[in-house]
Amino acid sequence: MLDKNKQIWFIGIKGTGMASLALVLHDLGYNVAGSDIEKYTFTQVPLEKAGIEVKNFDPANIKSNAEQVIVKGNAFKQDNPEVAACLDKNVEWQSYPDTVEEIVQMHTSIGVSGTHGKTSTTSLLAHVLGEVAPTSYLIGDGRGKGVEGSRFFVYEADEYRRHFLAYHPDYQIMTNIDFDHPDYFKDQDDYTSAFQTAADQTKKALFVWGDDKRLQSLKTDIPKYTYGFKDTDDFQAVNIEKTTTGSKFNVLAHGKDLGRFEIHLFGDHSILNTTAVIAVAYTEKVPMDDIKEGLLTFKGAKRRFAEKDFGDVSVIDDYAHHPTEMRATIQAARQKFPDKELVVVFQPHTFSRTKKYQKDFEEILRDVDKAYVTPIYASAREASGDISSEDLVNNIPGSEVIDLDNIADLTKHKNAVVVFMGAGDIPKYEDAYEKLL
């Protein structure tokens, strides 16, 4: 249990989720510190900025439960020196999800789950609600903020290994249910069952995308509101106007016009995410004029269609690594840059996912002006596999395999938008390319 009279010690504090959580607790007035590997990571920057002590792993860091509340990262097992020290000293620990659940219960809480769009929607919801009321948030890209006395707590609910089943929020947005994480979930039914349990644990209302049949099939004892573009949706986006600066649209709540909203975001998925945010805010009786203002100042989530310009070349950095996300990112790029050559540099993420979605990846990349595929990013759990980037390229006319040693090939593209897509270490390819511009 969290306790302001004890030190909150994080084993693995540099993990993206753990770093975010440490920042939230620090902001909420807890005494936070932690440890991790010595290697420098981007997540330690905000920790250091906040004055949170980050040490190397050392058994001496572990005291007693009378002095410390230990939060252990999911990746660390008995071979970690601090985990071993906990076992030797009979010191109990709690998990990341257990700790988040404690914060969930302190607030009017809104979880955002789904295969795609979690980070973007969580970021948008946290920003918009934060403009009208004190709001704490926890986002999967390494960002977290606590506000003492906050009304709302907005958090990204990750389905991997069923972590989100530790949570019992007031509200939950579910963006979609596409099968993912084949290394853990047996099949689509197994995956969907996790979302059914998450829905069962939501207290006040569920907000789901109306076009997703699996979301539609979820059984709930609480109100389940749909959002989308159809007349049958409870919250419907209508009169949509897309331009190269973003999108404008009205939202109807059960047929009632809530007004016209403008976002500096691109693609249908951004309109859907925004409609979900508006639906939650409306249900919590947040004034719509405040929501409109908040939407106008939102700049986007980290690594979600993040843009830089170099003369006539625009570079987009995006986390997309699943077919649905890739299609959304490409649609957004075409909306914002209709007159530029669309070049995609895609890093397949894990061998199992690449094998499962090979045909989808090939179909998507055949539709861009030029496709490059990097070597497959291997995960710690899956170091090799029986598929390669060459297998994809062989089925995509005009495409090429690209690596750091031939990254200069990208410089031949002029008046182009170059989209780097992937969830691994693809920023290293982008950095190498940008140094040549």
UniProtKB/Swiss-Prot annotation:
Catalytic activity line of the entry: UDP-N-acetyl-alpha-D-muramate + L-alanine + ATP = UDP-N-acetyl-alpha-D-muramoyl-L-alanine + ADP + phosphate + H(+)
Entry-linked Gene3D superfamilies: Mur ligase, C-terminal domain, Mur-like, catalytic domain, NAD(P)-binding Rossmann-like Domain
Binding of ATP, residues: G114, T115, H116, G117, K118, T119, S120
Localization: Cytoplasm
Alphabetic keyword roster: ATP-binding, Cell cycle, Cell division, Cell shape, Cell wall biogenesis/degradation, Cytoplasm, Ligase, Nucleotide-binding, Peptidoglycan synthesis
EC id: 6.3.2.8
InterPro entries registered for this protein in UniProt: Mur-like_cat_sf, Mur_ligase_C, Mur_ligase_C_dom_sf, Mur_ligase_cen, Mur_ligase_N, MurCDEF_pg_biosynth, UDP-N-AcMur_Ala_ligase_MurC
GO molecular function: ATP binding; UDP-N-acetylmuramate-L-alanine ligase activity
Gene Ontology biological process: cell division; cell wall organization; peptidoglycan biosynthetic process; regulation of cell shape
Chief location of this protein within or outside the cell: cytoplasm
Recorded GO CC terms: cytoplasm
Pathway(s) where this gene product acts: Cell wall biogenesis; peptidoglycan biosynthesis
Family: Belongs to the MurCDEF family.
Matches recorded under HAMAP family: MurC
Purpose: Cell wall formation.
Protein name as it appears in the record: UDP-N-acetylmuramate--L-alanine ligase
Native species: Lactobacillus johnsonii (strain CNCM I-12250 / La1 / NCC 533)
Taxonomic path: Bacteria, Bacillati, Bacillota, Bacilli, Lactobacillales
